[in-house]
C-alpha cells in the first residue's frame, strides 16, 4: 500500500490506499464537549411513584432522584449519574422518564454498553417494543463484547420474549466465541438448549 495525503476542506488527512471512503464531518463543540442532538431530559419532572413500594423505599427513591437531578443540573455530562437516575426512575414505575434518561446517556456516550443494555431490558419488559429491545441489546453487545451479562440478557429476550431458540442459541455462541475464557455461564445455557 502507498501513503496518500488529501486535503478536505482545509484539513490534511494521511492514510493508506486510495482513501476514497474518507469523509470529514464537522462536530459542534460547546464548553469543550461535543454538542448532543438529543434534548436534555427534564430534571424538574414531577416524581410520580406508580410502582408498589413501601413508604421508606418511596422516600429513599424520591431523595435519590432529587439529589441526582440536582447534580446533573450542575454537570449534565456525568454518565454514571444518568445511568443511576434511570434506574431510580424505572424503579418508581416512571418508564418513560427512564427511557428518556437512558436515551440521553446513550447520546452523550454512544460507545458505552450499560445504557443500551438498560434500554433493551426496558423496551422488552416494560415498554413492550421488541424491535427497540433488539436494537439496543445489539448495540450494547457491539459496545461491550466482553460483558457476559449482556449476552445473558439478550438470550433471555430471544428465548422468552421472541420465542426464537435459533437466535437465542446464536447469541450464546457469539458470546462464547468473543469470551472463550469467561463464558462458562453462557456455555451452560447453550448446553441446556441441546
Q: Model-flagged regions — what are they?
A:
Residues 1-73:
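Long, contiguous interaction/recruitment modules in multidomain scaffold/adaptor proteins
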Residues 84, 118, 153-154, 188-189:
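Canonical tetratricopeptide repeat
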